[in-house]
Amino acid sequence: MVNPTVFFDISADGEPLGRVSFELFADKVPKTAENFRALSTGEKGFGYKGSSFHRIIPGFMCQGGDFTRHNGTGGRSIYGEKFEDENFILKHTGPGILSMANAGPNTNGSQFFICTAKTEWLDGKHVVFGKVKEGMNIVEAMERFGSRNGKTSKKITISDCGQL
């Protein structure tokens, strides 16, 4: 089985920054990968298109995926509001790792983050399910609009997304 690839076209205050593509590790975390894939295509009638990265901390990560409240308190999975931690096989080994944001054990919804550094303290707490395939330079460009408290200086949005 070939792991799926999805893309995000990223904008800053409506100006295109470029495309980031992700390999989703469906071979290791099929349920988590399928959630992200389906939210990227919007095939269930809801998903990431038009949503923003509400929290960007340079040297740490870019967090997005709250397409219901747009502030980090919302989002939902394709399985219902929340779903369980599938496993912690994969680790936060460095920049480009794609992992699920959560509010404690078994609270995965749609929020995710892209690591911009090694974040091993998140191992065993957040489910890693993919990695940046192409466009890490775009993630680095997004990072420049972040701050230490996570507030962004420009609105960083997913203007388009889907499966490749």
Curated annotation (Swiss-Prot):
Entry's Gene Ontology cellular component terms: cytoplasm; cytosol; extracellular region; midbody; nucleus
The UniProt record lists the keyword Metal-binding: no
Annotated control of activity: Binds cyclosporin A (CsA). CsA mediates some of its effects via an inhibitory action on PPIase.
UniProt modified residues of type N-acetylvaline: V2
Sequence ranges assigned to domain PPIase cyclophilin-type in this UniProt record: 7-163
Cross-linked residues, Glycyl lysine isopeptide (Lys-Gly) (interchain with G-Cter in SUMO2): K28, K82
Swiss-Prot/TrEMBL GO biological process terms: activation of protein kinase B activity; apoptotic process; cell adhesion molecule production; cellular response to oxidative stress; endothelial cell activation; leukocyte chemotaxis; negative regulation of oxidative stress-induced intrinsic apoptotic signaling pathway; negative regulation of protein K48-linked ubiquitination
Modified residue annotations for Phosphoserine: S77
GO molecular function: cyclosporin A binding; heparan sulfate binding; integrin binding; peptidyl-prolyl cis-trans isomerase activity
UniProt modified residues of type N-acetylmethionine: M1
Protein location: Cytoplasm; Secreted; Nucleus
Superkingdom of the organism of origin: Eukaryota
Main subcellular location: cytoplasm
Pfam families tied to this protein: Pro_isomerase
Residues annotated with N6-acetyllysine modification: K28, K44, K82, K125, K131, K133
Reactions listed under catalytic activity: [protein]-peptidylproline (omega=180) = [protein]-peptidylproline (omega=0)
Acetylation as UniProt keyword: yes
Placement of covalent cross-link Glycyl lysine isopeptide (Lys-Gly) (interchain with G-Cter in ubiquitin): K28
Residue positions where Phosphothreonine is found in the record: T93
Quaternary data: Interacts with protein phosphatase PPP3CA/calcineurin A. Interacts with PRPF19 isoform 2 (via N-terminus). Interacts with isoform 2 of BSG/CD147. Interacts with FOXO1; the interaction promotes FOXO1 dephosphorylation, nuclear accumulation and transcriptional activity. Interacts with integrin ITGA2B:ITGB3; the interaction is ROS and peptidyl-prolyl cis-trans isomerase (PPIase) activity-dependent and is increased in the presence of thrombin. Interacts with MAP3K5.
Family assignment from sequence similarity: Belongs to the cyclophilin-type PPIase family. PPIase A subfamily.
PANTHER family: PEPTIDYL-PROLYL CIS-TRANS ISOMERASE, PEPTIDYL-PROLYL CIS-TRANS ISOMERASE A
Name of the protein in its database record: Peptidyl-prolyl cis-trans isomerase A
